[in-house]
Amino acid sequence: QVNPGTPRGGGNVKGEDIKKISENKNIYSYVKRINSVADLIDHDIVETKETLANQSPERSKNFKRTVMLTGVNESSKENKFVSGAYKLIEGKHLENQDKNKVLMHKDLAKKNNLKVGDKIKVKSNLFDADNEKGADETVEVEIKGLFDGHNSGGVSAAQELYENTLITDVHSAAKVYGNTEDTAVYQDATFFVKGDKNLDSVIKDLGKLDINWREYNLIKSSSNYPALQQS
């Protein structure tokens, strides 16, 4: 494998490559996703009996207020919202032009007495393996909406709980790692192909772009759009 991914085994797709594909005439829309880690400032995460039982003293110290960020340019097209695992119950979805906005789980909001329109601060976590630059950034974000949804299986760490995931705009998720939207490392991207186009010929066409295709796979999805993932 020529693309080993991030230190934590996450995706490693370049923003500039996503841009090249998105500019193809047969693509009408796309979703790009960044996974990052940050700490809530002055707010607490959701814990369960399971997550507390599994916690080492070191983990409870280093990741006491740590949440997962899913940075996405259009949240209504994000996998978990499409599949129904997450459901927006209040406010509005994140859109392409949004900056410093988040969707928060209703249980996390309830625990911290937060509502749509409130602002919170998140900051880089220096113990996170994927924070390769040792970034120490603080980002203030506004809650644009609340979502619901619960893990189907058990979890060992609080960060795996849906309750402790913030859906953010791409800019905010990139910034906690000291990146911009252009320099960020993306988990994956999904491209929506115009309905009258033959998918195989579009994929063949994209293969001619100036992109190192040894690093990626274009996955053909049954719902008629290719997804870009690390190979």
Protein language model annotation of sequence segments:
Residues Q1, Y225-S231:
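Hydrophobic alpha-helical transmembrane segments of multi-pass inner-membrane transport and secretion
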Residues V2-S223:
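Basic-flanked hydrophobic alpha-helices used for secretion and membrane insertion
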